[in-house]
Amino acid sequence: KNSIGIEIQNPGHSYKYSNFSSKQIYSLKKLLKFLLKKYKILHKNVLGHSDIAPERKKDPGEKFPWKNLAKEGLCTWHTLSKQDLKNARKIPIPNKYQNIFLKNLYKIGYNSIRGQSFKINLKKLTMAFQRRYRQELIDGKVDKECLLISKNLSKI
């Protein structure tokens, strides 16, 4: 229905993608607190370009401090510990669980995938999810860790 876009200066993935400065994040937090309160925006509705258009956008990317913002109630983050996820990374899952992963993503606000380019779009959607919720490894593969995180988020 309505949206507010906030651009944060960063060269991006094509031009030496760099960390966001503490000054940028401080200003962003201050602005988000104001906007969320003034417009009664739910923290689950704070999204990045790649969450909305994963087939063509990569920003804000894996160096964006989503977890840090979530600690202040400014966006969502999963509640799983490193211990919960420790042995799940790179563990393949059967295809039927990929559908569960996609349903979980739909529940948390990502668009569903359709059309001839299903495999390509699945990879891009998964990479967008990983850039936000599993920033240490962005490979576009739906593994057990991605499934666990998506399941956890779908229940928040």
Predicted regions and their residues:
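Secretory-pathway/luminal and periplasmic proteins that interact with or process carbohydrate-rich
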Residues: 55-60, 132-139, 156
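Acidic, glycine-anchored loop motifs typical of Ca2+
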Residues: 116, 139-140
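Basic/polar, cationic surfaces and motifs that engage anionic cell-wall
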Residues: 17-113, 124, 128, 145-148
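Oxyanion-hole/transition-state-stabilizing segment in secreted/luminal serine hydrolases
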Residues: 8-16
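Short coil-to-beta-strand
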Residues: 1-8
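Flexible, substrate/cofactor-facing loop regions flanked by secondary structure
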Residues: 113-117, 132
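C-terminal accessory extensions appended to soluble enzyme cores
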Residues: 131, 144-156
